[in-house]
Each structure stands twice: as C-alpha cells, then as structure tokens.
C-alpha cells in the first residue's frame, strides 16, 4: 500500500466532504452494543479475505463493500475494477498488479486517497480524514470518533504500521527513523471494557477478527496521523 504521501493525496483528491460530514453524525455511548463494544466484529468477520498481492487497500474496500451491501467482490474482481479506474491522486489507474508474480509485494500498492473512488464504483459513499485535515474535511478522527462511527453503524478503514500490530521488527520508517504507515485494515469493533480493537486484516492468515491491544493499535494508527476512510 502507498501511504507515505497522505498529505499530498489529500491535496490532490476531491471528495463530497460537506454531504459526508453531515451524514456521519455521532452516536452516543448508549448506542454501543452492551455499552462497551462499538461495532459488530462477529458480523463483519465473514467478509474477511486474505490478500494475494500488495492490495490491502483493495481487500479492505472489498470487506467494507460486503459489510454495507452484503455482496463482497472477490479479490480478482476488485483488482479488475481498480485497474480500469483512474486514480484521483496520480496518473494512471488506482492499482497495477505487481509485474513479478513470485514477489507479490513488489508493486506500488494503492493510495488510500483512492478509497472513496473505489467504493463509489460499488455504490458505497465514503469520506477520508486524518489529524492534519479533520478541520478541512469536517470529519473527526481519533479513538473517540472511531468508536462513535462504529457505534452508529459506519464501516471504517484505517492506515497503520503492520509490523507494530504483528509484533515484528518495523521495516517502514521515515527519514527520522520513526515507524511509517504501510498497511490498510478494516476496524470492526472497539471493546472499551477489555481494551481491545477488532480488525479484519487481509495481510495475515489469522486476520479474521484480529484482536489487538488498544494501546498497540493507537500507536500503529498514529503512524498515519490517524487516517481513516469512513462510510457515510
């Protein structure tokens, strides 16, 4: 996934922000299932699929499409759509499959700013935001906002550092050596009582309803300045 130029992507991409921000709204804590679980990870788990290529953004989008419409596109199908859909961020299509089939992670991935365009092809509206652009987008981010979006029935894709949530040595760093976001996942639930964040993570064989300590998730998410794409 290409996430190192999120700021540039925000400047380049075009969204229907005003309508999206109004449609989002915020749920009260009482709207959370059982008072402590925001979202429904058990219901969302059936839409998890493991990725074959460097297409975590596409597979996260397919998961969300399944959650919203009940009709989840296959990896092959959503790759075909992404290959034929112009990017709003860069010249060419949203996605190009890696040329080296023996090294599926050798491609360029997908810009997170193309998520709304890809979802729109399937009739799913979404907006994107992060800490640096929340004022401009009118869409809040951070844990409190994430909980409320999930609690009110929205689907959410976030950008994180994968190695941090997998407990592996960090490979992607910025010029100062700080961890950099390199992976997209779907957040399906936040359990505030037990301090657990539930994910559908296409990047690992155990990614269906992957459960991550909240502190670890917050640190991994911070590498993208709390980037999220949320359905409206």
From Swiss-Prot:
A Pfam family reported for this protein in Swiss-Prot or TrEMBL: Peptidase_C39_2
**Record bears the keyword Signal:** yes
- List UniProt keywords, sorted A-Z: Signal
Q: Which domain of life is it from?
A: Bacteria
Q: Which residues form the signal peptide?
A: 1-32
Name of the protein this chain belongs to: Uncharacterized protein Mb1299c
